[in-house]
Amino acid sequence: MKKILYVFLIMILAVGCNNLSNTPINKTEQMLKKYQMLDNDVMEDLNKTVDSETTFSEAQKTEYKNIMKKHYQNLVYEIKDDTIDGDEAKVNVLITVTDFKKVLDESEAYLNEHLDEFKDEYGNYIASKYVDYRLEKMSEAKEKVKYTIEIKLTKVNKEWRVDTLSDETLDKINGVYKY
């Protein structure tokens, strides 16, 4: 009889603990940790994005992936609050990421002021030189920026699921949001 009660108690605890992880906050943390841990889904998305980039050489694609991996691993977040309304929820998160937007803006300004540095001996603009320059500046970036992101979730079959992230949220996570 004790063994039956013991097994029953273990089952109740297992089911109860499983429900503890099924909260909007926990699902949001799991999603953000996927970035920090370079989860397969995150890497697949990064690879698809980079592979579709036609102006990057293979070496530049590899360099960009390495920069973004480091960026994701250094992502810092703080859950601020959550709001649950039936089967929908919103979780507000303060994230700290590398400020790539500033670097990209400065790189573009440099290009405009020093266009001759990115031309060949015939005066033709060489896009790959500029890409190399931007990647170098991104790899040197140290400044951080804080953004508040709103993660939306929907409960499907009693399970909270993170909705598709908005472009704005993705830009913030990637450090390129125009502020």
Question: Which residues does each PLM region occupy?
Answer:
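A short hydrophobic beta-strand element
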Residues: 87-95
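Mixed-charge, low-complexity intrinsically disordered segments
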Residues: 57, 99-145
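Beta-strand elements of well-folded, non-transmembrane domains
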Residues: 95-101, 155-157
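Core segments of small alpha/beta cavity-forming domains
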Residues: 18-80
